[in-house]
């Protein structure tokens, strides 16, 4: 309930701003914020040496299969742009450890913002110089009906681990150890009494 009320208050404040300053002024301010974030991130990327960098991390298993779930990352830096490619990452799994595409993107940007320029405004402008490729059907970009109950709690770790490994080749003196390499979870399983389907939920 507190989160809902916070969102409603935020909505009210935004409406008040539009009523006070008008859409043109608000739009110009938003464009400026986006541009500022883009410029700062481009400057941060420019300070890194051009090249191609590789990293790999993994989850020990998916919960339903003992095989490791691999996350592979190829990062290319050219001037003020960066391309992050997760081709080679394991296909989506039957266990609840897949992560939706948007959560995987957050894992990439979280690390880049933290270590390249923590002062970059949190908006999409900072994304403009960064292209992220995540093949559909992988554990980082699954398709229906792949379970994604773990979302950012589980595969977020290997995504961040890959990005930290890449930055470790570029700015090792600025890095910490991995931010997280997994999470402790509670699993609940059973049968849906209305449909008879097997259920497995991860908390």
Show where each model-derived region lies.
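Glycine/proline-enriched, intrinsically flexible loops and inter-domain linkers
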Residues: 1-203
